[in-house]
């Protein structure tokens, strides 16, 4: 009987959390002219937050942007003066293009607002934050709001780009991979890996901060409280150490042992090494999804060395398969806006010291 009593006062809690990756689903909502994008119409915001949370994704996106800007952007003489200040915010054309590249690498698309006069002469160009853009089913309208998902949120409505209308509009670019209304980011196949890398970082942070991140037994040796108190204590411990902040723990409520609370760590099962191996494979998966080599972004996770020739060959391949296609997209976009080719990227000059 006593044995059964002891067992009844031992509580196990597996506090591992399965993280749900948002789906990039498109949906027509009754009463709304635009098509929603993801749960609560906030999938682009999820991608943006993923970029902010992941040092690896930031490094890749920012590096791709720098590579894509090249050594210089040559402008046609016809737009030289305009390029020095493309809007009332005082932005230069290069500023606008850099923002566009960032959006292309995070979201897979971009949007540019065009301001014209009554004779359809171009007056200003503005970058529109792509995470705030939605479109209607026939792609004739662009809707812009900073508060998608909030009750009662409103959106500014723009016409989709049409050079013959003689009024301002928005050039909406959704890339080449999508078969629907919204773009697909290049790294879509690596999103789970990016999430995993952020959880690994959190695990190590909490390992250092809390020194409490492996399977643990917690003995409360100052009496056995009733079930309500036990449940409350379990919730408090789970709230303190959850997700990647801890693993499975066990609470034991005992009548004595000098009224002390004792913490016993079980064998850690080489968890640090498992995380290290997981991080290595995760990193590889992220870079594969971006068709990139870690060394091009200052990383060489396996410490295998990387010769100058290998580096140059890797950059040449990456430049041909990722950077140049994105540069050509931007050149075509501005050809649309001005009616003729007006910009040309001078390739990034990669200098590698022996």
Regions found by a protein language model. Name each.
Residues 176-333, 342-351:
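A contiguous, surface-oriented mixed alpha/beta subdomain in the mid-to-C-terminal portion of proteins
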Residues 1-255:
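Structured, contiguous alpha/beta core segments that scaffold functional sites
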């Amino acid at each position: 009987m006593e044995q059964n009593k002891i067992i009844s006062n031992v509580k196990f809690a597996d506090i591992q959390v399965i993280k749900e990756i948002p789906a990039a689903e498109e949906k027509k909502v009754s009463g709304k002219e635009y098509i929603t994008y993801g749960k609560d119409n906030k999938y682009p915001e999820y991608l943006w937050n993923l970029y902010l949370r992941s040092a690896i994704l930031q490094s890749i996106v920012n590096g791709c942007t720098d590579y894509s800007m090249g050594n210089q952007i040559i402008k046609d003489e016809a737009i030289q003066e305009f390029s020095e200040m493309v809007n009332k915010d005082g932005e230069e054309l290069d500023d606008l293009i850099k923002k566009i590249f960032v959006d292309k690498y995070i979201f897979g698309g971009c949007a540019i607002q065009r301001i014209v006069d009554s004779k359809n002469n171009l007056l200003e160009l503005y970058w529109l934050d792509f995470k705030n853009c939605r479109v209607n089913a026939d792609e004739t309208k662009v809707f812009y709001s900073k508060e998608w998902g909030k009750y009662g949120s409103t959106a500014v409505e723009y016409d989709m780009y049409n050079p013959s209308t003689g009024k301002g509009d928005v050039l909406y670019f959704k890339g080449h991979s999508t078969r629907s209304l919204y773009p697909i980011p290049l790294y879509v196949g690596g999103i789970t890996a990016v999430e995993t890398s952020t959880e690994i970082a959190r695990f190590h942070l909490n390992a250092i901060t809390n020194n409490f991140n492996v399977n643990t037994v917690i003995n409360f040796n100052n009496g056995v409280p009733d079930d309500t108190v036990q449940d409350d204590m379990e919730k408090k411990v789970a709230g303190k150490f959850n997700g990647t902040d801890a693993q499975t723990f066990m609470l034991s409520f005992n009548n004595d042992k000098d009224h002390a609370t004792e913490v016993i760590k079980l064998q850690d099962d080489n968890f640090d090494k498992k995380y290290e191996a997981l991080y290595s494979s995760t990193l590889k998966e992220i870079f594969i999804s971006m068709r990139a080599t870690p060394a091009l972004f200052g990383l060489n996770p396996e410490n295998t060395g990387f010769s100058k020739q290998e580096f140059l060959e890797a950059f040449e391949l990456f430049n041909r398969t990722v950077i140049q296609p994105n540069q050509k997209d931007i050149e075509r976009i501005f050809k649309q806006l001005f009616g003729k080719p007006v910009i040309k990227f001078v390739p990034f000059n990669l200098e590698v010291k022996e």
